[in-house]
Amino acid sequence: MAFKDAINKMVSYFDTDEVNEVEEEVTAAKMEEPVVQEPKQRPIPSQQTSRQSQNPAMNRPTVARSQQTESDSLPTYPNRQESIDRRSSGRESVTASTARRETYQAQTTVQEGKTTIALKYPKKYEDAQEIVDLLIGNECVLIDFQFMLDAQARRCLDFIDGASKVLYGTLQKVGSSMYLLTPSNVSVNIEDMNIPNHNQDFGYDFDMKRR
């Protein structure tokens, strides 16, 4: 009996060793299971990275579209050379118009500076008023009294002389029966011809012509 009990103890001992080995294998398997399951859970970050890798590709068209819209929204300016040419042409037109204006003004000034001399042969006293009207219009008048009598010529001459003083004109004798009436803006230089002064008494040295 004692021998049998010893055999049973030895058998039970070996049985417990097997059980312990089985338990150790089970615990080792359980410890290895999370290591095996981790690769199954890791695809989640890989999916996120793949999505992130796909997102830039999807975002690129939007960036290109935004750049295209910005380029479309930017104002289009003309070429600098064209703008310079337009400015130069505008300046040339302005200078041309200015030159034309100055030429026109110069021509107008020359025309205004021209002096007209009217030759009058008064035959009656009423003609003196027409001569004074010409003086008012800033015209020079050359008066020849050869068709008037002495008395009428003196009356007409006195009237014209008084009007010339009122209008700041000048009356000068240029011949035996001729007088030059000029406005204030005209000066006349007459050479000394020993002509008597018109303010002095004088007599006509020619035969008065009748009408």
Curated annotation (Swiss-Prot):
Comp. bias intervals (Polar residues): 44-57, 64-81, 91-111
Keywords assigned: Cell cycle, Cell division, Cytoplasm, Septation
BP GO annotations: division septum assembly; FtsZ-dependent cytokinesis
Domain of life: Bacteria
Ranges for region Disordered: 15-111
Biased composition annotated in UniProt, kind: Acidic residues: 15-26
Membrane-crossing segments per the record: none
InterPro entries: Cell_div_SepF, Cell_div_SepF/SepF-rel, SepF-like_sf
GO cellular component annotations of the record: cytoplasm
Presence of the UniProt keyword Cytoplasm in the record: yes
Cellular location(s): Cytoplasm
Major location category of this protein: cytoplasm
Subunit structure: Homodimer. Interacts with FtsZ.
Described purpose of this protein according to its UniProt entry: Cell division protein that is part of the divisome complex and is recruited early to the Z-ring. Probably stimulates Z-ring formation, perhaps through the cross-linking of FtsZ protofilaments. Its function overlaps with FtsA.
Family listed: Belongs to the SepF family.
The protein's name: Cell division protein SepF
Lineage: Bacteria, Bacillati, Bacillota, Bacilli, Lactobacillales
Encoding gene, per UniProt annotation: sepF
